[in-house]
Amino acid sequence: MGILDGESKKARVGMERQDERLRSLSEANDRLMAKNHALAKALTRATQELTKAKAQLNQLAGPPMTFATMIRVHAANTDEQGVQHASAEVISGTRRMIVPVAANVQASRLEAGRTVLLNENMVIVDQHDTDTLGSVRTVRQVLDDGRLLVADSGGNVTLVRRAGTLAKENVNTGDRVSVDSSVRFALTLIPVEDDADLVLEETPDVTFDDIGGLDEQIERIRDAVQMPFLHRELFERYDLKPPKGVLLYGPPGNGKTLIAKAVANALAEGSGAGSGVFLSVKGPELLNKFVGESERLIRMIFRRARERAADGRPVIVFIDEMDSLLRTRGSGVSSDVETTIVPQFLSELDGVESLDNVMVIGASNRIDMIDPAVLRPGRLDVKIRVERPKAKQAEQIIRHYLTDDLPLTPGIEAKALTSVLVADIYAVSEHRHLCDVCDEHGQWSPVYLADVVSGAVLKNVVDRAKTKAVKISIESAEPAAIGVNLLAKAVQEEFEETRDAVLDADPVQWSRINGFEAGHVTRIRPTAQ
């Protein structure tokens, strides 16, 4: 029994050791399997990173693609297996080439002017949309076959074809187009800029009765402008053609613009067309540094005038500061842009398209700077000088602004105040002595306020007095009367401002603008303050 018990005990111990060893081996196996899974995941991640790095490296190592402009399909055919074999003419930069077309790119869909993509073997592999960017050119002429003569800012003319998208659009002379880098194709039509701010269109309500002191000038312009419009049958009966244009010239601020507006209003009332049209243009605003832009604006103005006059309405094209726009060619005073602007203006004035119901009225302070071709008979052949108002005319002007309806000093009528005001302004005495001017002979002459007064100055004096009356009324809470004292203060302020403006004035320019003889004044000596 003892021997059996010992053997049984040994067997039990051996089995326990065997179980423990199996557990150890199982745990070791689990640990190895976990490590194997971790290594497998790490290997998978490494493989993915390696694949990604390889893809990035392949991308970085890829050859560059080249952009080119499509010109035309050179050749195209399909073999027995249905594979396309085609070539095309393209231009890249300055290189003009014939290159193959990839089989997956349909040659029939390649359009002239479109952007194509070339691979490293100079094979067309893709086609892009027409480039919307590029240099801008102005169309000078549209040829019968659709090609365009375009000019750059320097006036250099190039012959170009239209790109596929532009071939279907209506292109006219004066339009602007973008061109490709090779300047072989016109790509897109540039939208026309809104030039409405350059031309003020209005129906004037100014009448000749609103203008004072210019009876002689009004009569002359009525004879030149209003009579031909209102009595067309008589002019036709006597085979007499109305003037194409009128030039109003003289010192600034004396009613040139008012006269033009009154003419437009009078023509409208007498024509029975309902309303006249007054197109007001500022000469300097038409000047543009880009070649062809000023000419385009002039064409636009006359085209608009013809459109407005088509229904029988009289149209006045009023060009203010005409000397800045139509300066004498070759004068060298500016960049000589007038060498093209003047001919364009004259061609519109003399052109084959009639200017029925259209009258051009120009205004200028410097008639000596306007090109003589503009002033010759048959163009702006009626020239009316608008002089500075004398004392009698000044009374007529002031009566438009100083009326009996205003709160005046009791017992004093507007007519009496006007006489006092005019006497003060036109006084030839030391208290209205502005300056002395010296001519080319060294002779000094006095200049008084009356020598530089204008209709605008007279209105300004009355407005100053009215403003003072308003301020006094606000401070005192009672209506203040306009009287001799307020008018005298207004005249004194206007005199002092005018005298101060003379201090820094250039003698030659000041004398020309103020209507003195050209070149007559060489020096200005202001009076002591």
From Swiss-Prot:
Q: For ATP, which residues are the binding ones?
A: 253-258
The organism's place on the tree of life at top rank: Bacteria
Q: Which InterPro entries match?
A: AAA+_ATPase, AAA_ATPase_domain, ATPase_AAA_core, ATPase_AAA_CS, NA-bd_OB-fold, P-loop_NTPase, Prot_ATP_ID_OB_2nd, Prot_ATP_ID_OB_N
SUPFAM superfamilies hit by this protein: P-loop containing nucleoside triphosphate hydrolases
Return the Pfam families for the record: AAA, Prot_ATP_ID_OB_C, Prot_ATP_ID_OB_N
- Coiled-coil zones: 15-62
BP terms from Gene Ontology: modification-dependent protein catabolic process; proteasomal protein catabolic process
Q: What cellular component GO annotations does this protein have?
A: proteasome complex
For this protein, the record's SMART domains field holds: AAA
Q: Give this protein's Gene Ontology molecular function annotations.
A: ATP binding; ATP hydrolysis activity
Q: Which controlled-vocabulary keywords does the entry list?
A: ATP-binding, Coiled coil, Nucleotide-binding
Output the Gene3D superfamilies linked to this UniProt entry. 1.10.8.60, Nucleic acid-binding proteins (2.40.50.140), P-loop containing nucleotide triphosphate hydrolases (3.40.50.300)
NCBIfam families noted in UniProt: pup_AAA
Q: Which HAMAP family match?
A: ARC_ATPase
To which protein family does this belong? Answer: Belongs to the AAA ATPase family.
Summary of subunit composition and partner proteins = Homohexamer. Assembles into a hexameric ring structure.
Name of protein: AAA ATPase forming ring-shaped complexes
Q: Name the gene.
A: arc
